[in-house]
């Protein structure tokens, strides 16, 4: 059915790689990205494998590159990305790479260490400069006789009486500004008020040499008397992480020190600038190549990690690997192996042998940028079983269509389409930017899904004739009120006296026929609008749901045919399709029949389909108030119900009984027993050897029909079949009801849109003055914001999730088992894209 409708045919192959060529061959296979290696050493510890040292060396180089990258980003230097895909370095080149990275790392560490020491020295000199400047102001203030009274508490009364000369000690330092209040309280309490503290803020913040952050600090000077207070003050300063600096006592000494400090600061600033320039040059040179280095190192690491999955023969000259690969790509894989052998200079070619296996191969569905998003929707439910029907190509149409049935609005569909078209047109630019925003990346990866959802929403919006809750009168309404004036003698008084009047479509000229496309715009102003639309959308939901489920059941036939399971066709597919069509397919026929059999004149006598369908199961036909739809209805409905009931034992009993009979017959005829020696014609040991051109088994799942060695358990088979039968029969009812969400979501979206129009934009349209025009500007902004936030994003997400549910449960469970595992080829693609995470 083609590569899109069914997963690729896979084969298990064995590779024989010469030791000197293994690295280059695996490198070429990584560039190709078409093989998935199997681990042939599952019981060997990861630290005991052959190439563990090479992997560690690659990890060490990777660590050094991450350090360099961190420094580059810290310096706000852009990393150059030319999109280049460098070739994998040879193993002998690893030494040069290690030496280069070691040199860059050591150089950066040395620069950082020197720069940190210089900055710390610069900080100390800067703080000392401010201390000398501020303390001079403090001492000038202390010379003021008015301050003598403030400092009198530092002197004992007896000493003041004796006229002893005043001998005060002091310490000066710098402290973080936010610690000043606590620092001051601690000094006061510990020293009992016998110290004098003066502090002044440093206007400019100072750079912390360790963190690089800018910190606001203050200069302080503390006066005290005696060694005991001096020790207490120093301990408090140490506890608050204050930096203390020596400060001369005389103004002349302070002036000379300040001059020397300024000179040293100027010299140090020059050295710092030169150091920073050198650091920038090193980082800029590294920024030009770091992406290429990352790719090279990650490729080498991936190759050695893959080589650790291989076996080594006893001669130590050959590596043996097992890979899953698509059959269609065998030639390109052979060519890649030849190319790798040539690059390595080996004279012995690498060998690829296909193997026979009963193991289930991985599932590989080829995708492009358009089908990728839809395949992800399917894979999110479960990876398809090998070679079963792939729902993705059908989902491309059904998913956006069912979404649009719930979301249908012309205006909202246009907005969604425009957004998707913008992403599609700008996809190359957006991809090159490598946006790391996870939410935007998710939306961008589904740009084609959003595009189709928007296009289908425009289509369903035209059918509903709904654009921002308003109808478009494109072709002119088919309804006319004029004949009601002629036939029923309506007058102007009739219009004034009756707030609501009903048009009679049975009157000639009132209804001129169906609207050319979609729903007549006159229904937008009708009071019974919801009654009409609910009936239409409910029946439409049932019809679409039953067709969708019948299509899913029909797809199961292709699976049964491909996997050669005739029992599933005779005792699964046929009764399932009969059961669904005899009950729910008949309901669809009744809906279409009622639409065509009754017109405006006879619609009053139209019976209720709901009551008819319920009576069909109850075999109740005595209700005279609900007339028959057609002659012979009773007999046909009784026949259909009986047929549906007969399908239940057909699905439940026949398959287990046939399987049991086949098992007993095989057990009786499959082997003979002569003297306790079992004789048979099973495969020999030689048949299981590696062969070059064998064909992989079509279906390697657990077979439906047990082999002669398997013990057939009739009880388990019966229970399994009973579960399947009950699930299908009840699922037909519940799944049909589940499709009514199409009607419910469509109704909710239309009502929300109408409420938003009435409660927001209509307010601005009602005001006829100039102020109303000005108010409309702001009201429209609110209307646009609410439309995008509620109706496009929230309602769109809700409809998206409901469409997911309808596909995962109601559609895919009819034919899709989803019990496989994904094909994960060894590929350098993610490394090339800059996704360096393992």
UniProtKB/Swiss-Prot annotation:
It is a multi-pass membrane protein. InterPro entries: V-ATPase_116kDa_su, V-type_ATPase_116kDa_su_euka. Residues 408-409, 472-535, 595-639, 751-771 are vacuolar. One of its GO terms (biological process) is pH reduction. Signal peptide: none annotated. The chain crosses the membrane at residues 389-407, 410-426, 442-471, 536-555, 574-594, 640-659, 726-750, 772-810. The keyword Phosphoprotein applies. It holds the Pfam family V_ATPase_I. Keywords: Cytoplasmic vesicle, Hydrogen ion transport, Ion transport, Membrane, Phosphoprotein, Synapse, Transmembrane, Transmembrane helix, Transport. The keyword Phosphoprotein applies. Residues 1-388, 427-441, 556-573, 660-725, 811-838 are cytoplasmic. It comes from the Eukaryota. One of its GO terms (molecular function) is ATPase binding. The modification Phosphothreonine is found at residues 250, 360. This is V-type proton ATPase 116 kDa subunit a 1. It comes from Bos taurus. The gene is ATP6V0A1.
């Amino acid at each position: 059915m083609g590569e899109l409708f069914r997963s690729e045919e896979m084969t298990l192959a064995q590779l024989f790689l010469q030791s000197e060529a293994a690295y280059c061959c695996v490198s070429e296979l990584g560039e190709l990205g078409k093989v998935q290696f199997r681990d042939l050493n599952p019981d060997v510890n990861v630290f005991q494998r052959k190439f563990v040292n090479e992997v560690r060396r690659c990890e060490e180089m990777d660590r050094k590159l991450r350090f360099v990258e961190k420094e580059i980003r810290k310096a706000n230097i852009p990393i150059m990305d030319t999109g280049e895909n460098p070739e994998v370095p040879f193993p002998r080149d690893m030494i040069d790479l290690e030496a280069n990275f070691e040199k860059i790392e050591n150089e950066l560490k040395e620069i950082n260490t020197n720069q940190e020491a210089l900055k710390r020295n610069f900080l100390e000199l800067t703080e000392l400069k401010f201390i000398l400047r501020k303390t001079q102001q403090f001492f000038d203030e202390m010379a003021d006789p008015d301050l003598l009274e403030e400092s009198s508490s530092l002197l004992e009364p007896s000493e003041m009486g004796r006229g002893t000369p005043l001998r005060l000690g002091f310490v000066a330092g710098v402290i973080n500004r936010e610690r000043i209040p606590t620092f001051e309280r601690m000094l006061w309490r510990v020293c009992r008020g016998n110290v004098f503290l003066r502090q002044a803020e440093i206007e400019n913040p100072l750079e912390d040499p360790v963190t690089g952050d800018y910190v606001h600090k203050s200069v302080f000077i503390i006066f005290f008397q005696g060694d005991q207070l001096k020790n207490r003050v120093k301990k408090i300063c140490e506890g608050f992480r204050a930096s203390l600096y020596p400060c001369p006592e005389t103004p002349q000494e302070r002036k000379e020190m300040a001059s020397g400090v300024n000179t040293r600061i100027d010299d140090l600033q020059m050295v710092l600038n030169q150091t920073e320039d050198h650091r920038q040059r090193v980082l800029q040179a590294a920024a030009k190549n770091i992406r290429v280095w990352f790719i090279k190192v990650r490729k080498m690491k991936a190759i050695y990690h893959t080589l650790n999955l291989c076996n080594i023969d006893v001669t130590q000259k050959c590596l043996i690997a097992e890979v899953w690969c698509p059959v269609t790509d065998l030639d390109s894989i052979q060519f890649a192996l030849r190319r790798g052998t040539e690059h390595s200079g080996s004279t012995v070619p690498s060998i690829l042998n296909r193997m026979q296996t009963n193991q289930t191969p991985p599932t590989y569905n080829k995708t492009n940028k358009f089908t990728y998003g839809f395949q992800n929707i399917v894979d999110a439910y479960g990876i398809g079983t090998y070679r079963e029907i792939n729902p993705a190509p059908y989902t491309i149409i059904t998913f956006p269509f069912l979404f649009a049935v719930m979301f249908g609005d012309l205006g909202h569909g246009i907005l969604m389409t425009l957004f998707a078209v913008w992403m599609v047109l700008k996809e190359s630019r957006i991809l090159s930017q490598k946006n790391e925003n996870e939410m935007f990346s998710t939306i961008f990866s589904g740009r084609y899904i959003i595009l189709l959802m928007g296009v289908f929403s425009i289509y369903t919006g035209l059918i509903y004739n709904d654009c921002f809750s308003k109808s478009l009168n494109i072709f002119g309404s088919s309804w006319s009120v004029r004949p009601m004036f002629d036939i029923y003698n309506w007058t102007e008084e009739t219009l004034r006296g009756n707030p609501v009047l009903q048009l009679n479509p049975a009157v000639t000229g009132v209804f001129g026929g169906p609207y050319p496309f979609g729903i007549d715009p006159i229904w937008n102003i009708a009071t019974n609008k919801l009654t009409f639309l609910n009936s239409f959308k409910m029946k439409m939901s049932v019809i679409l749901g039953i067709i969708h489920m019948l299509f899913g059941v029909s797809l199961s036939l292709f699976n049964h045919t491909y996997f050669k399971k005739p029992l599933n066709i005779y005792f699964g597919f046929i009764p399932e399709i009969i059961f669904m069509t005899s009950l729910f397919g008949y309901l669809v026929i009744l809906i279409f029949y009622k639409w065509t059999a009754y017109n405006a004149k006879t619609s009053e006598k139209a019976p209720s389909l709901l009551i008819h369908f319920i009576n069909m199961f109850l075999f109740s036909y005595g209700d005279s108030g609900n007339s028959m739809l057609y002659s012979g209805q009773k007999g046909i409905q009784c026949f259909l119900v009986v047929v549906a009931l007969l399908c239940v034992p057909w699905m439940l009993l026949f398959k287990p009984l046939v399987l049991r009979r086949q098992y007993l017959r095989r057990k009786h005829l499959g082997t003979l027993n002569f003297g306790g020696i079992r004789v048979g014609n099973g495969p020999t040991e030689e048949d299981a050897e590696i062969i070059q051109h064998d064909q992989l088994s079509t279906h390697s799942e657990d077979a439906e029909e047990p082999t002669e060695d398997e013990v057939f358990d009739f009880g388990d088979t019966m229970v399994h079949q009973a579960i399947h039968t009950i699930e299908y029969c009840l699922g037909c009812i519940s799944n049909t009801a589940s499709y009514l969400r199409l009607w419910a979501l469509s109704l909710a979206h239309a009502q929300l849109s109408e409420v938003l129009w009435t409660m927001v934009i209509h307010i601005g349209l009602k005001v006829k003055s100039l102020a109303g025009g000005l108010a409309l500007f702001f009201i429209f902004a609110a209307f646009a914001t609410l439309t995008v936030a509620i109706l496009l994003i929230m309602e769109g997400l809700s409809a998206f999730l409901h469409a997911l549910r309808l596909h995962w449960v109601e559609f895919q469970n009819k034919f899709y088992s989803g019990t496989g595992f994904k094909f994960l080829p060894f590929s350098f693609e993610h490394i090339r894209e800059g996704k360096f995470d393992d």
